[in-house]
Amino acid sequence: MINPRNLRLIIAVIGLVGIFAFFASSQHSLVDRTALQVNKPAADSPHVPPPAAAAAPVSPPPPSQQQKQQEGSQKQLNDENSDEKNTLQGTSYSGTKPPYEKVDGKSNKILADKLDTTKNSKPNQQQQQNTQKGASEEKSAQNKITTPEEVSMDNGKCNDIDYVVMIDAGSTGSRVHVYEFNTCVKPPQLLSEEFEMLKPGLSSFDTDTVGAAKSLDPLLEVALKKVPKNKQSCTPVAVKATAGLRLLGETKSKAILDEVRSHLEKDYPFAVVSEDGISIMDGKDEGVYAWVTANYLLGNIGGKEKLPTAAVFDLGGGSTQIVFEPDYKVDEVPVDGETKYHFTFGDNQYTLYQFSHLGYGLMQGRNKVNQLVLKNKLSELNLQKYTKKEVKGAKATVDVSNPCIPPGVVAKDVQVELGEDEFYVVNMKGPSSKDSTVAGGSQCRYLAEKVLNKDAECTSKPCSFNGVHQPSLTRTFNKNSDMYVFSYFYDRTNPIGMPSSFSVEELKDLSKLVCQGETFWKDILLDDHVKNLNEEPQWCLDLSFITAMLHTGYDIPLHRELKTAKTIDNNELGWCLGASLPLLDKNNAKWTCRIDKTD
């Protein structure tokens, strides 16, 4: 007989042992289940469990925190893509960076496709590894923009770097652009740009062809320093002259360009582009290349997907260009002819409207306005007439009142060309500050609009100015797409405090302020801006001409936003980059590597 006291002790011991065994078994089961969920081997793993165990039903684990974050990111990205489709190019442009951030060189749509792949994958370790591998391969493909053109291979990787030297022989000066490209991708990726400019332009040398050619030497020295010596013999160099040399006449301009080609071929190691490599560039090419430059740097062209593009307005010294991609309504028919430009870039085709208005660059516009002022008073003035050779360094002896000069300001020794080889030199004086009908630029705006010749016959309606056909920007260009104005448009707004984004009406107000004179400048502008205005007495005329061209000439509404910049991502705007890209196609670039004489 067991003592009741001993019996209770035995029962208590058995109970404790049972409880301990239960907890030990539960903990072991929990560890096994956790290991099964987290470390479940793939089907092709050498450690696959026995079939019976593998067949046991296992509930799929809940989505991981990483998946939730990816799904949230995907939803946010889809929302952003929806907004981007509505606003086309996003927020206002800062002046030095693209208006939206691109991911791995592609549009956000590609990233969304990649995230969709990740979101729909199962939480199997092997599948996750495959997804990560696929995403890595896709990201690599995205960086290349399109299928890479592997020109030279090193351990299976393309590392081709090529250079282009482009010289812009403009009307007021010459500029060199030395571009460095990664040519392993299509379109080529711009890595860096070296830029230098000097004055005067080639056209100022007139018949001194040797002097004109040698004037480019400082620019070519920049190229020699930038391009590695082992690359120089296979680096193309081109010299493209614009309106200034075009206005010099065919005989004189050809003599200068022939001497430039000879100088490059004899004295420099670069591969000189044949045929039109050293030439006067056609105005339509100048505008289209400027359009390519801007939209290439903005990321609008070059990818597989066709994106909305920006309109481009370029203002040089001798001519101005307009280029945009019209979107015609159903009831509108594009006009064939010289204004229509069709070409292919990357995987997409573009049909552009373009026109180069020769004689309507800023310096030519100045001269046209000053012509009107002087012609009205020429009969009552005793002025000496000069030829183009004689006018250099000539001093004025007569003052002429000009409504395009601010009150109290004098533009000294202004050369006015009235006809072929007919020049006069005068001092242009601003009106009295008491004359409210003149001060403020109203009369100057009238003169600026008059030189645009809006009353000229328009044979193919609608027209912009001087009888030139132009599709309506209001009807055929999306109101949310960007309009970029650069070169002299930038040079006459940025130095006096204008932001990188402004309306035509704000430009008109700025023009009025500048024409009112220094008394008003000091109340509104910073000291540096006032200093800049004092250094250029014809700033009022320039702004009046620019405003008239954009609003009255091109018919851009007053409320329309414009964007201006000198560079995008530290790369110069203008036609040079657009003209350099085709030279990288070694099969069709019209140049061959030179034999390196140092070898």
Swiss-Prot record:
Q: Which residues face the membrane's Cytoplasmic side?
A: 1-6
Q: Where is the composition biased (Pro residues)?
A: 47-64
Q: Which residues cross the membrane?
A: 7-24
Q: What's a single GO BP term from this record?
A: filamentous growth of a population of unicellular organisms in response to neutral pH
The family database entries (Gene3D superfamilies) matched by this protein are listed as:
3.30.420.40, Exopolyphosphatase. Domain 2 (3.30.420.150)
Q: Does the keyword Membrane apply?
A: yes
Question: What's the protein's topology in the membrane?
Answer: Single-pass type II membrane protein
> Per the record, which residues fall in region Disordered?
41-105, 117-155
User: Keywords of this protein's UniProt record, alphabetized?
Assistant: Golgi apparatus, Hydrolase, Membrane, Signal-anchor, Transmembrane, Transmembrane helix
Q: Which CDD domains match?
A: ASKHA_NBD_GDA1
Entry function = After transfer of sugars to endogenous macromolecular acceptors, the enzyme converts nucleoside diphosphates to nucleoside monophosphates which in turn exit the Golgi lumen in a coupled antiporter reaction, allowing entry of additional nucleotide sugar from the cytosol.
Family the UniProt entry places it in:
Belongs to the GDA1/CD39 NTPase family.
Q: What is this protein called?
A: Guanosine-diphosphatase
Q: Which organism is it from?
A: Candida albicans (strain SC5314 / ATCC MYA-2876)
